[in-house]
Amino acid sequence: MTDLAIHLDQVHKRFGNVHALRGADLKVPRGTIFALIGPNGAGKTTLFGLCCGFLGPDRGRVEILGGAPDPVRLKGRLGALPQDALLGRDISVREHLVFLGRLQGMDPPTAEREATRVLGLVDLADLADRRAGALSHGQVKRVGVAQAFLGAPDLILLDEPTAGLDPRHAHDLRALIRAQRGQQTIVVSSHNLQELEAICDEAAFMEKGVTIESGAVATLTAQDAEFFVQLAPGPEPLELLRSRVVTTAVTWEPERRTLRVRFQPTPGRVAEDVIAEVLRELRASGARVCALGKGRSLEQRYLEQATPSVPATSSVSEP
């Protein structure tokens, strides 16, 4: 059995004159929580359609759970939340989920139990008998998430899963996704990069139909090779650190009074060792530390790689 839940190799897909995918490559390891990041029009929705078997590639290879993305082969093994999930307005939420369970091959009692289970996952058990047409937008989104988890599939694709949710239910959904690590493979497409950084193991950046970078979130954000220290007003210790601590680079951002330290980790000198050295020198110089963090945000890393469009305002708390 392959270790990859998703493997795309030089995949192309056109819709008339629109070249949605231009040789996209993607490897998603089994059991990971994986972030798919990119602007509108990057090809993320098309990629999801290929993974589900709703679309076929014009060129290249698509392999899902060790084989071709055939909807019959993937029945019960792949669940998906489209960005705009639609429900039958005149049937109850329970009836909708039981119907989908029956389509997966469940017998009626099993489908009933699964509907009850997944509604509990998204805190909608008390609305099981309400007509879908009477639900709020956020409740419809949560039913869509429940639908994706129906039958405990091996692979789940979630397109903007927390969009439209109130803060408590968004928090609960993030916790639900994190809890599946190692049990199911979940791919999350979202514009909320701070959220993706908090829940995902690996990520891929897409732009104009290609994957421009991918890897472990800790590697992309340089968690093991970079850190920042924000200082209270006082002398700038830049030259002191450059002369006393062995690093690859030390830069000073005066407007935010932030030192950014980059280094090459070795088995005998890891991030925590370099952080301790820098803090020792800062303390000896009388500098006062306000904040400390490892790496840079996923948003910063993405913006470094992406083609500039309009000026972006960071929403993360890192200085």
Regions from the language model: what does each represent?
Residues 33, 154, 182-185, 225, ...:
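Generic structural signal for secondary-structure transition and capping sites
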Residues 225-305:
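Short, charged/small-residue-rich alpha-helical element at the C-terminal edge
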Residues 1-12, 308-319:
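ABC-family P-loop ATPase nucleotide-binding domain
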Residues 101, 177, 181, 221-224, ...:
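Hydrophobic aliphatic residues
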Residues 69, 191, 215, 233, ...:
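Short beta->alpha linker loops
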Residues 211-231:
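Conserved beta-strand-loop-alpha-helix hinge in the C-terminal portion
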Residues 4-6, 13-24, 28-207, 212-213:
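ABC transporter nucleotide-binding domains
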